[in-house]
Curated annotation (Swiss-Prot):
One of its GO terms (cellular component) is endoplasmic reticulum membrane. The keyword Membrane applies. Required for the post-translational delivery of tail-anchored (TA) proteins to the endoplasmic reticulum. Together with GET2, acts as a membrane receptor for soluble GET3, which recognizes and selectively binds the transmembrane domain of TA proteins in the cytosol. The GET complex cooperates with the HDEL receptor ERD2 to mediate the ATP-dependent retrieval of resident ER proteins that contain a C-terminal H-D-E-L retention signal from the Golgi to the ER. The gene is GET1. Its main location: endoplasmic reticulum. One of its GO terms (molecular function) is protein-membrane adaptor activity. Keywords: Coiled coil, Endoplasmic reticulum, ER-Golgi transport, Golgi apparatus, Membrane, Transmembrane, Transmembrane helix, Transport. It is a multi-pass membrane protein. It comes from Vanderwaltozyma polyspora (strain ATCC 22028 / DSM 70294 / BCRC 21397 / CBS 2163 / NBRC 10782 / NRRL Y-8283 / UCD 57-17) (Kluyveromyces polysporus). Residues 37-104 form a coiled coil. Pfam families: CHD5. This is Golgi to ER traffic protein 1.
Length: 225
């Protein structure tokens, strides 16, 4: 297998994995964070949250009338802790947003841009050959081997007197078209699996209620007419 195909498959697989794990990425980024700010802020937030919970439990266990001074003192502590926790939440959000931006830049530089460069550089690379030039019409062969730009460039080349098929030495499917078909197939399979496996089943009662509402709506519209 040619290195171009291997590289293209690598980028497709990595991008799909990132797409499927998008809901967990923030937790992973925070867990393996190299930023000392997020680590220290998270520890401080956990410490103050535990302290707030302890004071709340203590206030619930005592009577405000019998232990008014202690109850009031705890309330003042809770108010102070709420302010500190709110400040920590704000600082944590800023730190996490900054780290997410760094991750997105890293993804752009290591995945998105290299994949785009590969498609632009090797977009016309023939992944596999077509037996003969007569297998498909000339325009279809042109699109398969040259990409979708073949169609808008066709009249321009015709007016300039350039043969649009002069570069098609061997008919085949180019990398750009192959990647388009591959990603479309993956998306279709993914959609079917979601619908068959992960889509919640609508109960008969819900269906019957929906039908009743539709009938009532039609009856109301008929009465209005």
């Amino acid at each position: 297998m040619n290195w171009v195909i291997i590289a293209a498959l690598f980028f497709v697989i990595i991008n799909k994995l990132l797409q499927y794990t998008s809901r967990y990425q923030e937790a992973w980024i925070n867990k393996f964070s190299i930023s000392s700010d997020i680590s220290s802020l998270s520890k401080e937030y956990s410490k103050l949250s535990a302290e707030r919970l302890k004071i709340k439990e203590e206030n619930q266990s005592i009577s405000a009338q019998d232990n008014y001074a202690r109850w009031t003192k705890n309330n003042r502590k809770l108010t102070k802790l709420e302010g500190e926790l709110e400040k920590l939440r704000s600082n944590l959000k800023i730190a996490k947003d900054s780290q997410s931006k760094l991750f997105n830049r890293l993804k752009l530089l290591t995945l998105t841009l290299p994949f785009m460069i590969l498609k632009l550089w090797k977009g016309k690379f023939i992944v596999y050959d077509i037996p003969t030039k007569d297998t498909f019409p000339v325009i279809v062969n042109g699109v398969l081997s040259q990409g979708l730009l073949y169609i808008p460039l066709l009249p321009i080349n015709f007016l300039r007197g350039i043969d649009p098929n002069k570069h098609i030495l061997v008919p085949g499917v180019s990398l750009g078209i192959w990647l388009m078909a591959l990603t479309k197939t993956i998306d279709t399979v993914e959609f079917i699996v979601k619908q068959l496996v992960f889509q919640p089943v609508v109960s008969k009662q819900v269906k019957e209620k929906t039908k009743e509402k539709v009938v009532e709506l039609k009856t109301t519209e008929a009465e209005l007419d």
